[in-house]
C-alpha cells in the first residue's frame, strides 16, 4: 500500500520511532554515557517513554544546545516522490541522524559508540515492513558534521511502495 497523502508520513515516522525504541541495545547506547552501556540494566517501557521518546530518539529535526550530553537519534522524512500522474508516493526517503559527543565515542567494546548506534538502527529497520508502506531499504551513511564536541552521522533509508 502506498502513501496516498503526506498526512500518513507522520504516522509512519511514529512507527519507525516505536521500532527503534524497542531495541534495548540501541536504547542502552543512547541512555548510558558510560563506557560499558551493555552492562547497564534495560529500561522499562515506562522509563523509555519518559527518558527516551522525544529526548534521545526524536522526530523533531532540531537538537538544542543543552542536548549534547548524550547521544541522540533524530528521524526525519526527507522526501516523497510521485510516479508521473500517479497521486500516490512511490518512494519515501527517511533520514536518521546520530549525534554523538566525541567524549563518548570510546566504550569498553571492540567498536565505537556511533557505529554501534548506526548498526543497531540498521538492524531495527533494514528489510522490515512498516504498515501502510513497504519494506525499508538502505542504511547508507555519511558524516554530516563534526565539531570539537560532537559528531553527526546521517543514515538514509528508502521505503518503496508497491502497487
Predicted regions located by residue number:
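Acidic, Ser/Thr- and Gly-enriched intrinsically disordered low-complexity segments
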Residues: 63-74, 104-126
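Acidic-leaning, charged glycine-interspersed low-complexity segments
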Residues: 27-28, 112-163
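Residue-level detector of alpha-helix boundaries and kinks
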Residues: 1-5, 105-106, 142
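Active-site-adjacent structural patch at catalytic or cofactor/ligand-binding sites
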Residues: 73-104
Amino acid at each position: 500500500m502506498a502513501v496516498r497523502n503526506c498526512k500518513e508520513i507522520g504516522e509512519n515516522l511514529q512507527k519507525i520511532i516505536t521500532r527503534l525504541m524497542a531495541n534495548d541495545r540501541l536504547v542502552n547506547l543512547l541512555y548510558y554515557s558510560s563506557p560499558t552501556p551493555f552492562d547497564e540494566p534495560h529500561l522499562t517501557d515506562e522509563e523509555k517513554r519518559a527518558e527516551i521518546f522525544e529526548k534521545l530518539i526524536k522526530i523533531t529535526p532540531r537538537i538544542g544546545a543543552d542536548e549534547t550530553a548524550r547521544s541522540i537519534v533524530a528521524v526525519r522524512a526527507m522526501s516523497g516522490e510521485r510516479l508521473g500522474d500517479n497521486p500516490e508516493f512511490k518512494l519515501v526517503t527517511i533520514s536518521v541522524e546520530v549525534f554523538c559527543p566525541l567524549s563518548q565515542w570510546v566504550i569498553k567494546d571492540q567498536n565505537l559508540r556511533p557505529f554501534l548506534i548506526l548498526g543497531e538502527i540498521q538492524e531495527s529497520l533494514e528489510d522490515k515492513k512498516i504498515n501502510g508502506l513497504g519494506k525499508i531499504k538502505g542504511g547508507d551513511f555519511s558524516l554530516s558534521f563534526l565539531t570539537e564536541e560532537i559528531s553527526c552521522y546521517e543514515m538514509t533509508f528508502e521505503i518503496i511502495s508497491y502497487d
